[in-house]
Amino acid sequence: MQALTVRPGDADSLAVTEVDEPSPGSGELLVEGLALGGCGTDREIARGSYGWAPPNRDRLVIGHESLGRVLKSPQAGDFRRGDIVVGVVRRPDPVPCGACAIGEFDMCRNGRYTERGIKEIDGYGSQRWTVSVDYAVKLDPGLADVGVLMEPTTVVAKAWEQIVRIGERSWFEPKRVLVTGAGPIGLLAAMLGTQRGLDVHVLDRVTD
């Protein structure tokens, strides 16, 4: 099958290449890729300034903003053939830091996490991919057209979560918010702010 791969550190290596078909292990889903998002991190990897290949490999399948349809699932569990899913990007440090040990591996303190399509694990940029059921998120079928935005939306949701955690240490009743930057993350942040009932303002630089 075909996949979008790169040699991390090599700015001229991005290519569609042939890779082996994935074989799901115990507790894994086999997924047909439907859509793949690209962001600034992917551009950095393609430029050769970021990214790490899996151990003993020189190429990495990129892509961490995923959307797919389940082709095969374990008999037991919540997933079924045809489900629309996205894959979680990060995996915790196998010798966990304090944050990883309590399940907050998005806040890993020692940097020994791995990430699909970024750091030492192939990403979701292939025709088919596998993912553990523990790192798959099932979406409502009505979100199929926008589901590829789930991963960047989680980045924004985490930012809001941290804002609320800090604010609620004392009296906290925000009325308005300023979002600096009108890229994908900034626009998603503005949308979530509006969803919270806030008066949202977005600031960006115009260079044209």
Language model features by range: what are they?
Residues 173-182, 194-208:
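Adenosine-nucleotide cofactor-binding segment
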Residues 94-177:
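NAD(P)H dinucleotide-binding glycine-rich loop of Rossmann-like/cofactor-binding domains
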Residues 152, 181-184:
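Glycine-rich Rossmann-fold phosphate-binding loop(s) that bind the pyrophosphate
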Residues 22-36, 50-98, 140-142:
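Glycine-rich beta-strand-centered segment in the early N-terminal region that forms part
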Residues 41-47:
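Cytochrome P450 core scaffold surrounding the K-helix E-X-X-R motif
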Residues 187-188:
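Residues forming the Rossmann-fold NAD(P)(H) cofactor-binding site
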